[in-house]
Amino acid sequence: MEININTQGKETVAALCGRLDTLAAQESVAQFEALQEKARGTVILDCSKLEYISSSGLRLFLTLRKAADTKGGKVIVKDLSADVRKVFMITGFMNLFEFQ
């Protein structure tokens, strides 16, 4: 799992690449905590190269969304693959995020 973070002004883009399984989620906690610090603005999670997401990965997304809500920011999830979109639909996460 690779996460590339780029900030310009109040917009932060995090490009996720690979599988966000349980182990990768544990290894990505620090990067998601860094995103929470930037959650006053807009955080875009670019999922165009995200192949898989586990419940641990979903927890990271949800924690980031809660931080953004608290700080008056927002999280946008962008370019979900069909397989990852199905996970979001089954778990009800389609109702929790703004999608592009």
Q: Whereabouts are the PLM-identified features?
A:
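Amphipathic alpha-helical interaction surfaces in cytosolic regulatory modules
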Residues: 19-96
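Short acidic-hydrophobic, aromatic-tinged amphipathic segments that line or gate anion-handling sites
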Residues: 98-100
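Short beta-strand/loop segment at the start of cytosolic alpha/beta domains
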Residues: 1-15
